[in-house]
């Protein structure tokens, strides 16, 4: 039986042609036992439990192991399941028998793993690459979801070859549209998920008493429309139950919870809502105007 390291190493080798040196952009070759070396001699080793660190230099982030453990618990509870089901349906509607799928801002990998599993269940052959600048998230993804190519990467300098992606997922994560345009195939598309006005309304109304109690994604969507051709927009809205024992994890994983004073957080934990509003916008965009 193969170890997680061996499974992930095999996946990275199989997807090597999709990757590019973050320093010079050259293609890689694999050198045993576990190194990617580009044509210019820049080398990157596969780290345990099976991910590759493809940054020019290390980056410090706010995202630590505790946050990603909390994120995994919340996602595993089914909180985002209706969103992921719809994301899968949209990709499956393209009727591709095989596709290359990048998750830009993959975190600890749960969303990508679920989408890949759903697509594979319909008979689609998926080559998947997860990218995130937070090493702790990527490390956890490699541990929990072996078989996908997990990379520590900067979305402003994606270590991937041009025109290789059929689909780029970008779920509640920052974007770099210049890089996304470079990575998309001519018939590929970006599937971006952003909050809508009522996302986590119950938390916002408790934490804020001013205009921050509501949210606008106008600046995000306007910027996207400037860079790519928007093909389709839809809204996914539902109420999701949240178990009391998961609420502390929820506050750990969402930026809304990072700025609550201790007294306010304790008050919230003593008066928990039974459900939270999930209100998200799915945007499908392509590079049609560039052709």
Task: Give names to the regions the model predicted.
Residues 97-107:
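Conserved class I S-adenosyl-L-methionine
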Residues 2-60:
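N-terminal auxiliary segments of SAM/dcSAM-dependent transferases
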Residues 108-123:
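Conserved SAM-binding loop of SAM-dependent methyltransferases across substrates and taxa
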Residues 146-158:
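Conserved SAM-binding strand-loop segment of SAM-dependent methyltransferases
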Residues 156-167:
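A short acidic, Gly/Pro-enriched loop at the edge of an enzyme's catalytic core
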Residues 15-19, 236-291:
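Conserved Class I S-adenosyl-L-methionine
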Residues 188-198:
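Conserved beta-strand signature within the Rossmann-like core of class I S-adenosyl-L-methionine
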Residues 9, 60-86, 90:
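Class I SAM-dependent methyltransferase Rossmann-like catalytic core
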């Amino acid at each position: 039986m193969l170890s997680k390291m061996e499974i992930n190493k095999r996946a990275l080798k199989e997807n090597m042609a999709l990757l590019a040196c973050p320093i010079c952009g050259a293609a890689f070759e694999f050198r045993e036992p576990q190194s990617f070396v580009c044509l210019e001699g820049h080398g990157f080793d596969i780290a345990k439990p099976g991910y590759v660190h493809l940054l020019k230099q290390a980056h410090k982030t706010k995202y630590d192991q505790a946050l990603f453990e909390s994120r995994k618990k919340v996602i595993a509870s089914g909180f985002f399941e209706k969103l992921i089901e719809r994301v899968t349906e949209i990709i499956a509607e393209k009727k591709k028998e095989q596709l290359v799928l990048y998750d830009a801002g993959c975190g600890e990998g749960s969303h990508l793993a679920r989408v890949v599993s759903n697509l594979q269940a319909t008979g689609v052959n998926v080559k998947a690459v997860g990218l995130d600048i937070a090493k702790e998230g990527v490390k956890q993804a490699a541990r929990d979801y072996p078989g996908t190519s997990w990379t520590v990467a900067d979305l402003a300098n994606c270590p991937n070859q041009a025109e290789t992606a059929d689909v780029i997922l970008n779920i509640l994560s920052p974007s770099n549209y210049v890089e996304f345009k470079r990575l998309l195939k001519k018939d590929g598309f970006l599937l971006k998920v952003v909050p809508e006005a009522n996302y986590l309304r119950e938390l916002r109304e408790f934490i804020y008493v001013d205009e921050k109690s509501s949210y606008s994604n106008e600046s995000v969507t306007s910027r996207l429309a400037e860079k790519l051709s928007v093909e389709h927009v839809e809204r996914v809205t539902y109420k999701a139950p949240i178990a009391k024992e998961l609420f502390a994890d929820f506050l750990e994983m969402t930026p809304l919870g990072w700025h609550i004073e201790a007294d306010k957080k304790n008050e919230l934990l003593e008066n928990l809502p039974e459900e939270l509003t999930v209100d998200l916008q799915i945007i499908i965009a392509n590079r049609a105007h560039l052709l």
